[in-house]
Amino acid sequence: MDVYPPRRQGLPRARSPGGSSRGSPSVSCSRLRQVQSILTQSSKSRPDGILCILGIDSRYNEGCRELANYLLFGLYNQNTSDFEKTGFSEEVLDDVIILIKSDSVHLYCNPVNFRYLLPYVAHWRNLHFHCMTENEYEDEEAAEEFKITSFVDMVRDCSRIGIPYSSQGHLQIFDMFVVEKWPIVQAFALEGIGGDGFFTMKYELQDVSLNLWNVYSKMDPMSLESLLSDDLVAFEHQWTSFFANFDTEIPFLLELSESQAGEPFRSYFSHGMISSHITENSPNRQPFVLFGNHSTRENLNAGNFNFPSEGHLVRSTGPGGSFAKHMVAQCVSPKGPLACSRTYFFGATHVPYLGGDSKLPKKTEQIRLLSQIYAAVIEAVLAGIACYAKTSSLTKAKEVAEQTLGSGLDSFELIPFKAALRSKMTFHIHAVNNQGRIVPLDSEDSLSFVKTACMAVYDIPDLLGGNGCLGSVVFSESFLTSQILVKEKDGTVTTETSSVVLTAAVPRFCSWLVEDNEVKLSEKTQQAVRGDESFLGTYLTGGEGAYLYSSNLQSWPEEGNVHFFSSGLLFSHCRHRSIIISKDHMNSISFYDGDSTSTVAALLIDFKSSLLPHLPVHFHGSSNFLMIALFPKSKIYQAFYSEVFSLWKQQDNSGISLKVIQEDGLSVEQKRLHSSAQKLFSALSQPAGEKRSSLKLLSAKLPELDWFLQHFAISSISQEPVMRTHLPVLLQQAEINTTHRIESDKVIISIVTGLPGCHASELCAFLVTLHKECGRWMVYRQIMDSSECFHAAHFQRYLSSALEAQQNRSARQSAYIRKKTRLLVVLQGYTDVIDVVQALQTHPDSNVKASFTIGAITACVEPMSCYMEHRFLFPKCLDQCSQGLVSNVVFTSHTTEQRHPLLVQLQSLIRAANPAAAFILAENGIVTRNEDIELILSENSFSSPEMLRSRYLMYPGWYEGKLNAGSVYPLMVQICVWFGRPLEKTRFVAKCKAIQSSIKPSPFSGNIYHILGKVKFSDSERTMEVCYNTLANSLSIMPVLEGPTPPPDSKSVSQDSSGQQECYLVFIGCSLKEDSIKDWLRQSAKQKPQRKALKTRGMLTQQEIRSIHVKRHLEPLPAGYFYNGTQFVNFFGDKTDFHPLMDQFMNDYVEEANREIEKYNQELEQQEYHDLFELKP
């Protein structure tokens, strides 16, 4: 349980309006891995780390800021006013230093910006925070000194450092002396707290800007979201402006020039190119608008940035100087990968049905011919895109495109012209990076780039017998592909692909009426159907806001006005003008509204082939089918029900009546169209005042987008294969069948992990004692006498032996016991939990692997044992709480005090790293709630769909054991020493309690943080279990409980090699040495007596001399001496305070003392003394 209510993940932060969101942890980790890949390239000159310094400390270097924004999803794309909203100065928020190493990250920040950065970085693997506490940060001088020492510590193990010197489009000549002038780099040379010398002399610096630009140019889910919500919106806006030019100039359309028509594209491109600092002269990346016969191959491939002159008008660019029949247009994003080209028409591509047989005039036939060629080109390009998405082969895509073009021409009965047209056709696909640069299609990174597929049919002759050239037809789309590698049951690897056409929402078909007689014909059509004696019968109702859909996959719905008559309907559009559908042309007409007022009402029209000449060419589909969608709550929706519905249900002279159908009566194609209309209605009907989501609207326009985003979220993370059985779960198509997931005969593994001193062992003992009735328990603990915390090979051998032991039992017992057996894995050390998972996944025996399954992983956290100093965490502290792996986090101290600051702070940190984890309070490992115990002993938490998907996204390659967990930093050593002699309890306790005062700051070398083991003290015969936690300064000495122990214990292997030594202590600390540990421990044992040195007169103390005098001053005096009561006097009158024979007395004393010393030394030599680590005989 949480100490406080679970907060929504992510803390408030300043962010520019409309800026990118916080981003998903998987994309964040993927971006970090992309940057780290620069450090793992097979190059002798590759750097050991990439240094990113923000703010004034790097003199606001743009390259560093760009890298930070890439990793932090644009957090520092803010202006001054945004920073002011936070209440903190820019200098405080920019106070960040990031050092990226190949398998870890060091991050310096301050307590203020820590909370802004945390949601972005908490899930990074092997993350090391260099940050002060709030109280420490109040001392400005200490804070500055801490920053310098942190910077020195961060780069200590490097020799070659990469600098992101330049930002994209602003390449600068790298100058390490400029870097040396950066304030924090200058401070590196300070005496006392600095790094003992100049930074640029101690480290080799190199510019990694170009490497990073290649990383930035790759598409991932976040950059795709930005592309869709920002770049694509701006791109489509240019087309909207382009259409507006034509729609407003309809009365004067013939006088419109190419230059005027292309003004939106030209301004958009030229202004963007100026600000992008990118020079791209490829003709494929140039905008253009060309009318009629001016759209020749020569003009299209000229690559000239300037638009043609004002002299090329619609009026004069057709065959023989007549008006143009069509135009080709291309818009190009100047700072992004988007580009698409279209062919639009001047004049009607169809003749409205007016009740009799109407023949197309010759000029309309030319337009119809061009539109049919164009429709075939569109189909060919889309077929080529689909083929390329599946095969990644340009050659195959070109073949498919050419075949599709041929079959398209056949379908329009253009067989006589096929040979002439195919000889003038070209098809190509270009890959474009995020900055709009064309890159090789066959490069290894091309999968992550947007591509543009284009087909052009150049210089089309007047195929209807006229002279001259009609011009060219061009169509292109920007698309993105996604490819997931899938591992089948037999071990083979196949691919699952998906693609989305990004520019598909730009109208593919459009036409404008330019000649007076065409406009008059359109007006005549409107008047004819509204007349009293109209062939469509009586006018019923009409209105705007209807959408016309066709079965043609290449066309999009057209919004227009619909007018209903007793014998048909009229759909009018501002560009396509009138489309008349009489009941005489209908085979049937159905109606579907889902019996709900929130469902789009759909008129489903199955029409006869005789209607085709009276439909625009893009409404010709594989099946003769149209759908008119009426949105709920619209006026036309209500009018249809009141004026049309009842009347049309009655059969008239045509024999056609409206048939109401249910959902099961819809064909697959009809369901697809209705679903698309429903999504569009949902996107357009946001509540008043709520900003319409551009992504939601785009998703309605691009039905395949939602599926592609799911697919791309998986494929963009890594090219490691996904298991076939897991793929539906990853794509959120299905959930794992729980009855299938945990088979009854599998042994459930419950993993409890944590740092030393986290009370994981106590929790383990509690669980085993409490749940003996659940069946048989096996307990695995890590090997103690090893420098590594976890041995995968040892764990795998243990699993094999445990399974073998079960199989050796009788069949009846085995069936019972295997159902009841649980394995509790207790790992108390600096173990990365992913290593344990991968050890099971990569077990060499597939039968063993199949016999065990992980139920849940629980991490124990002792708040007092998390920080080495300040907010610098112990190694693997956050990694032991990783999302996708760990289901529960148990806090084992400070749980009795309400909202203890340390506990709250750690919960906030871990919640950012693992938002889905359950928090459990268990003082000293004792769980008090039944529901918490159920969480820890869960049988399926680890294998839930959410956890499985998170594992694949966060740890690519985990299933096959390919993920490198990274090294432990700082290096923590685990030294186990065995001995057979008792310790002196008082000396041992005193030595332990003195450790805390000797703890050294970074780099922490020689620090002892934990002592644990089993020993005997000289005052008792009982074996005692001791545990000492240095940071908490807590020492526990408890008798070892006698009784059966969980079989088999891994320590038995170690004991065999230790002979008769039955006591051991494990010392855990930083860069410890065994000799030093043994010397420390010897001082806790009974000390070996030392030989006494023989005395000399010079060694006698004044006290000893006085004692000798007092003892012998009454002895007889030699001749010539007498005692006067106070002094000794000779016959010469000399006086002395001491007896005249004092020298003899002292010699006698020394001689006697030396006899005693010699006797003592002789007895000492005869005594047998054993060193603490000496084996017993």
UniProtKB/Swiss-Prot annotation:
Q: Where is the composition biased (Low complexity)?
A: 11-27
Where does the record place the region Disordered? 1-27
Any Pfam family hit: DAAF9_N
InterPro entries, A to Z: C20orf194-like, CobW_C_DAAF9, DAAF9_N
Q: Superkingdom of the source?
A: Eukaryota
PANTHER family (UniProt xref): DYNEIN AXONEMAL ASSEMBLY FACTOR 9, RCG26366
Chain's role: May act as an effector for ARL3.
What is said about its interaction partners and assembly? Interacts with ARL3.
**Name of this protein:** Dynein axonemal assembly factor 9
The gene designation is: DNAAF9
